From Swiss-Prot:
Annotated region of DNA binding: 83-111
Family label: Belongs to the ERT1/acuK family.
Species lineage: Eukaryota, Fungi, Dikarya, Ascomycota, Saccharomycotina
Disordered: region residues: 1-75, 122-158
Source organism per UniProt: Clavispora lusitaniae (strain ATCC 42720)
Protein name per its UniProtKB record: Glucose starvation modulator protein 1
Record keywords: DNA-binding, Metal-binding, Nucleus, Transcription, Transcription regulation, Zinc
Length: 487
């Protein structure tokens, strides 16, 4: 079957000549000639029939559109950025320049990477220049003048210096050769993530939460209620406190820690304060030497010898588990292990405090160094103590013990569970000091200066099997007029 095209009036066609030679389909150099065979005209009029057979009527070469084998598809690697031609034609571009598609089409001289349009949120915002050259020059002149060197710095100027320093850090981060510019990433998601990281680095770090001693020992702090309500009172002074002015080396009292970590969310939201165990042990040693010293006391020779013997016994008990504690402490990875251990401690402390509110047993919670971190209201009222005085400074459980025998027995029991023995419960008896403060009445009518207790200790261990926390529940032994003891 052949197709006959109508003759255009005024034109004649010589035998054997094509339509393009008569000017109907003009030719131009560089454009491939369209064949005028009947099959070609049929392909032009019905292109869908040719496509159904897997052939394109205007295909340049069979090698350019040949089907790839599964091995070839698996072996080829897509490039991160295509060239202009492959990007416009939605073709698979290669890594080499010029790419294979451009070489096959004789477009090797025009093969270049496509230039992508930058999103609006990726555009860099320039920091507005501060018009203050005259003020900076006057500031340098003031620094050169010797008579004005003693003036304190202006807080507002110091704030501006901090702002300019952070902006300079951000600019150096963008212009640094070690950092990769945002335009080198070929994904908008990577570019956005890179910009967010730059903002995090340029912004100031989270405020420190180390509270100085002058605030930790302030007697005007409120009382921390452990048994009445879940919410602890907050003073306006603590809310307006500037955490950024704190020093990490300073001690943070348990009272301030109670303000910072009031729930589980606060432990993960705020910066974790590492606890300095060596300093706590040094304070414990100083207390023991002061407690068992007999200088300035009217003691007999036998009493002095007894105190000296008790102190040496305590030091020998401490020396038995001290090397294990030191070696484990040195093996920790700073600062992450210390932060993890302190987070675990604060998390367990919240759980045990919530548990102490559910029962009426007088409870004291202390660290492995003996430093008290929590105390129930029942025991505070029973001993006539002030909770703010106990928790606002470094107070050891040994300071509440009445006699030296109770202190020696404490170290003997703690040494039995410090290393090796993993028994987590201890039952013992001890005597605690009953010293009513001014304006505070105790619940006991005893005339003695102490109260004898039967206590149960629960030892909570950390990840390294060291005693992390000791929860002591104390049941008072009250004498009756008949000579029988009641619990």
């Amino acid at each position: 079957m052949s197709i006959r095209f109508p003759e255009i009036p005024g034109t004649t066609r010589a035998p054997g000549t094509s339509l393009s030679s008569r000017g109907i389909f003009p030719t131009s150099p560089g454009v491939p000639q369209i064949p005028t065979t009947p099959n070609s005209y049929s392909a032009l009029l019905h292109p869908h029939k040719s496509e159904a057979k897997g052939k394109h009527p205007l295909s340049f070469s069979s090698s350019m559109t040949k089907r790839l084998t599964p091995q070839e598809k698996k072996a080829r690697r897509p490039t991160s950025r295509a060239c202009v031609f492959c990007h416009s034609k939605h073709l698979q571009c290669s890594h080499s320049r010029p790419c294979q598609n451009c070489i096959k089409r004789n477009l090797a001289h025009e093969c270049r990477d496509v230039v992508r349009k930058r999103a609006k949120y990726m555009s860099t915002t320039e920091v507005p220049a501060v018009s203050g050259e005259s003020s900076s020059e006057s500031g340098r002149a003031t620094g050169e003048n010797g008579s004005e060197m003693g003036n304190p710095p202006d807080p507002q100027i110091a704030y501006l210096d901090g702002v300019f320093e952070r902006s300079s850090i951000h600019e150096s981060l963008q212009d640094s050769p070690m950092s990769t510019p945002a335009s080198n990433f070929n994904s908008n998601f990577l570019n956005q993530e890179y910009m967010m990281l730059g903002d995090l680095i340029s912004k100031p770090s989270s405020p420190s939460l180390d509270v100085p001693m002058m605030y930790a020992e302030n007697p005007s702090r409120p009382f921390i209620s452990l048994g009445q309500s879940d919410e602890r009172p907050k003073s306006p002074e603590f809310n307006n406190f500037d955490f950024s002015s704190l020093d990490k080396a300073q001690y943070v009292s348990p009272l301030v820690s109670h303000h910072i970590y009031q729930n589980v969310q606060d432990i993960y939201a705020n910066k974790v304060i590492d606890f300095d165990y060596p300093s706590s042990y040094h304070s414990l040693t100083s207390f023991l030497r002061q407690r068992f010293s007999f200088t300035g006391k009217s003691l007999s020779d036998s009493e002095k010898a007894k105190k000296r013997e008790n102190l040496l016994m305590i030091l020998r008990l401490i020396a038995s588990y001290r090397p294990t504690f030191i070696s484990t402490h040195k093996a920790l990875f700073r600062p992450f292990d210390f932060q993890f251990l302190e987070m675990s401690f604060q998390r367990c402390l919240l759980d045990y405090e919530n548990l102490s509110r559910l029962n009426a047993s007088p409870t004291i919670i202390w660290r492995r160094t003996g430093e008290i971190v929590s105390m129930s209201n029942d025991l505070v009222a029973l001993l006539g103590l002030n909770i703010s005085t106990i928790l606002s400074k470094r107070t050891f459980i040994l300071e509440l013990m009445y006699d030296d025998e109770s202190i020696v027995e404490y170290f003997r029991l703690f040494e039995s569970v410090a290393v090796g023995n993993l028994h987590s419960t201890i039952v013992t008896r001890c005597k605690l000091i009953k010293r009513p403060s001014e304006g505070i009445e105790t619940n006991t009518s005893m005339d003695s200066d102490y109260i004898e207790f039967c206590s149960v200790w629960t030892v909570k261990r950390d990840l390294f099997d060291l005693p992390m926390m000791v929860v002591g529940q104390f049941l008072p032994v009250l004498p009756t007029p008949d000579g029988f003891r009641t619990y």
